[in-house]
Amino acid sequence: MSQQIYPVPAHAKEHSHLTPADYARMYAESVEQPEVFWAEQAKSLDWVKTPTKIKNTSFDAHHVSIKWFEDGELNVAYNCIDRHLAKRGHVTAFIWEGDDPHSHDIITYHRLHDEVAKIANGLRKLGVGKGDRVAIYMPMIPQAVYAMLACARIGAVHTVIFGGFSPNAIADRVNNCQAKVLITADEGLRAGKHIPLKDNVDTALAEHDCPSMEQVIVFKHTGSHVSWGKDDVWWHDLTDGCSTDCPPEVMNAEDPLFILYTSGSTGQPKGVVHTTGGYLLWASITHKYVFDYKPGDIYWCAADVGWVTGHSYIVYGPLANGATSVMFEGVPTYPDVRRIGQIVDKHKVNILYTAPTAIRALMAHGDFPTEGISGESLRLLGSVGEPINPEAWHWYYTTVGQSRCPIVDTWWQTETGAAMLTPLPSVTAMKPGAASHPFFGVQPALVDGQGNELSGATEGNLIITDSWPGQARTVYGDHERFVQTYFTTYPGTYCTGDGARRDEDDYFWITGRVDDVLNVSGHRLGTAEIESALVSHNAVAEAAVVGYPHDLKGQGIYVYLMPNEGVEITDELTKEVSNWVRKELSPIATPDLIQWSSGLPKTRSGKIMRRILRKIAANEYEQLGDTSTLADPSVVDTLIEQRLNR
């Protein structure tokens, strides 16, 4: 790991929100007197009823309960839109850049208000009300944000489904949360390719029983022909004549705001529930301090609203702070790898927040991504989704940031709501690849496999010892799964599932997942979900999926397969199985390497030893550790001999 230290640049200290002394004082108060600290921070939101009960939380596995501001009342959409109108209604909320470089739009806060009110009234016309679930399967267009905020305005609970997911994944999520309405578009656009969103929805509803689904709202984005059913309604028809006046529903701070599905290590995705008050405060306060955001900044989070980064740092955090954000439909490499730089120059972007995968994709082209690009407007860079390797950090810092922009390398999860470990641009000297220090209220610790806390410079399992306002409250419809997943491994603490090390300067470095969840290009994928898709193919008897180091994606997907008897292994079959996963689950889940084998390493009780498979996939087969419980050690020798990642 790099131990090179980059001091805080002088310009980052000027007019900043925090000095190192401010951070030390505020952090101490946030962990020593959380009720006092968070009551003060909550004043940054507009409340219908100011909360007096600030923190009521328990990590006891017999009674896991997380409540913040529980007697407070507010509306998220009001906080993100209405309260800005009097003084900032004319200010741009979103600069939208289409996949096609010639497509763009400007959405002011006034226009955002009117568009959200119309679709909110449209939803009310369809009978959607407080507590109803609405699925959103949209491209990266402003209407995706309008739909999310419309749900928040009327008290409906949204679940955004990433536009790259398959019909099966759509149906699973719709059925799990019993969504009443689904909002989609005719098609999406990505790198010039048309993504058949409406067709995917049609397939999901035709091939699966989705009894809760009553209506599908379709936004006309590309204008391509789509099939039509009796339960379909065009967005423009629904909103035509709808009023731009839509009184916001008064919500309790602990009412659910959204459900977002994240991969679990035991098969079915988990519907992580975030609530209204604590989440909004957490998203907004982290956006303000992590990015040192100030009015007038042009801020760009290059994520997708289908993931939590898009929820917190495209929609809720920036809008609560009255920010101006860039929203980008396309990919960093289309039409060519200078697209990011061109958008930065075109809109004079000051803050750029993207994923190591995107950084590595651009880095592969050397200096070309910045050829003809000024980049002089940039003052801050950010990284999210997975640990950034020092080589990519250096390229980002020198080539994109011109060796003058601090990098905030943030660690957090769907379940944490927003940033947890992060440098602060005016406070933290940077170490390439380090997530650095905890944000206000976050109390990290490292423990060994038995749960004993480790002190000093060490490596272990990362836990959080107390609650924070943006913490997920439960898994939708399955609180026991929430408890078992996060609170039983190391009782009395939140188990992140990540490993980390702490250096002699108390900087935290994330070392990767310790469970069976992969982090592919910043997207979390459950190995069990991929294995389930693989074994549903008629040629596959058994499957085991592990991650391995991948230059571009961070983690690649390495698949071990046992064929059914009589199946002939061919290149065509391998390609077919790969495409099968792509269709059943998502293009993101497409295997990088598929190794066929007559056997898998199993214990005598029949459990696959994935630890060994991970070592082989990573070419670390000389460090297999204890293999005494293997039923047939010769299987391992064969797998090593035939390994694909040489």
Swiss-Prot record:
It catalyses: acetate + ATP + CoA = acetyl-CoA + AMP + diphosphate. Disulfide bonds: none annotated. One of its GO terms (biological process) is acetyl-CoA biosynthetic process from acetate. Its EC number is 6.2.1.1. Mg(2+) binds at V535, H537, V540. CoA binds at R190, A191, G192, K193, T309, S521, R582. One of its GO terms (cellular component) is cytosol. The modification N6-acetyllysine is found at K607. Keywords: Acetylation, ATP-binding, Ligase, Magnesium, Metal-binding, Nucleotide-binding. The keyword Acetylation applies. GO terms for molecular function: acetate-CoA ligase activity; AMP binding; ATP binding; metal ion binding. Its cofactor is Mg(2+). Signal peptide: none annotated. Gene3D superfamilies: 3.30.300.30, N-terminal domain of ligase-like. ATP binds at G385, E386, P387, D409, T410, W411, W412, Q413, T414, D498, R513, R524. SUPFAM superfamilies: Acetyl-CoA synthetase-like. It comes from the Bacteria. Acetylated. Deacetylation by the SIR2-homolog deacetylase activates the enzyme. Belongs to the ATP-dependent AMP-binding enzyme family. NCBIfam families: Ac_CoA_lig_AcsA (TIGR02188), PRK00174.1 (NF001208). PANTHER family: ACETYL-COENZYME A SYNTHETASE (PTHR24095:SF243). Catalyzes the conversion of acetate into acetyl-CoA (AcCoA), an essential intermediate at the junction of anabolic and catabolic pathways. AcsA undergoes a two-step reaction. In the first half reaction, AcsA combines acetate with ATP to form acetyl-adenylate (AcAMP) intermediate. In the second half reaction, it can then transfer the acetyl group from AcAMP to the sulfhydryl group of CoA, forming the product AcCoA. This is Acetyl-coenzyme A synthetase. It comes from Pseudoalteromonas atlantica (strain T6c / ATCC BAA-1087). The gene is acsA.
